[in-house]
Amino acid sequence: MQKFTVHKGLVAPMDRENVDTDAIIPKQFLKSIKRTGFGQNLFDEWRYLDAGFPGQDPQSRKPNPDFVLNQPRYAGASILLARKNFGCGSSREHAPWALDQYGFRAIIAPSYADIFFNNSFKNGLLPIVLPEAQVAQLFDETFAFPGYTLTIDLERQVVVKPDGGEFAFDVQAFRKYCLINGLDDIGLTLRHKDKIKAFEAERLAQKPWLAHTMIS
């Protein structure tokens, strides 16, 4: 998992409340047994005018020119600004996968659905919670100033605006540790591989029959 310490990026405003996971990555794209390739179908039903299906060549699609991510001023955005209850709806880890694979490193919103919020941290995506008034101010400034960027300093837990103003945010210490060190669940487990090997060796010494393969 990619480490997250300080990130400066272009902001894209998703000016809708209650954006659900089916909007983030529609259900027809969940059939893949792979964990990659979801970025091209992020917000598929809003992003394109034609119906999308798995395996489709994105170059053959008809982009919706009115959708925020298709507007030239937001090309290359890596910070998504959203309204309240982002990521609601059914549980699907594909939602943070799609956002991450599109190129987003962080989301800023007043609130999130719990499962989406937890899944984001586990996949290297930082979901920042700010008060609605601060989020509204960021929306106003993003709309007013083309090329609007923010700097997110996870170590200091602040969002830094272009004028130097800062908005502080909270993040659980363990989640912060994992993001700064680029550790997902597998990475955390591998940090204890020596202890795991020692435990397995001791267990097999005490119960050698566990190593035998039963043949039926």
Curated annotation (Swiss-Prot):
GO (cellular component) term, any one: 3-isopropylmalate dehydratase complex
Tagged with keyword Phosphoprotein: no
Keywords annotated in UniProt: Amino-acid biosynthesis, Branched-chain amino acid biosynthesis, Leucine biosynthesis, Lyase
Enzyme type, top EC level: lyase
Reactions that this protein is recorded to catalyse: (2R,3S)-3-isopropylmalate = (2S)-2-isopropylmalate
UniProt-listed SUPFAM superfamilies: LeuD/IlvD-like
CDD domains reported for this sequence: IPMI_Swivel
Entry's Gene Ontology BP terms: L-leucine biosynthetic process
Keyword Cytoplasm attributed: no
Single GO term (MF): 3-isopropylmalate dehydratase activity
Top-rank taxon, per record: Bacteria
Pathway assigned to this chain's UniProt record: Amino-acid biosynthesis; L-leucine biosynthesis; L-leucine from 3-methyl-2-oxobutanoate: step 2/4
InterPro entries referenced in this protein's UniProt entry, alphabetically: 3-IsopropMal_deHydase_ssu, Aconitase/3IPM_dehydase_swvl, AconitaseA/IPMdHydase_ssu_swvl, IPMI_Swivel, LeuD
Function (record text): Catalyzes the isomerization between 2-isopropylmalate and 3-isopropylmalate, via the formation of 2-isopropylmaleate.
Subunit structure: Heterodimer of LeuC and LeuD.
Family under the similarity heading: Belongs to the LeuD family. LeuD type 1 subfamily.
Name of the featured protein: 3-isopropylmalate dehydratase small subunit
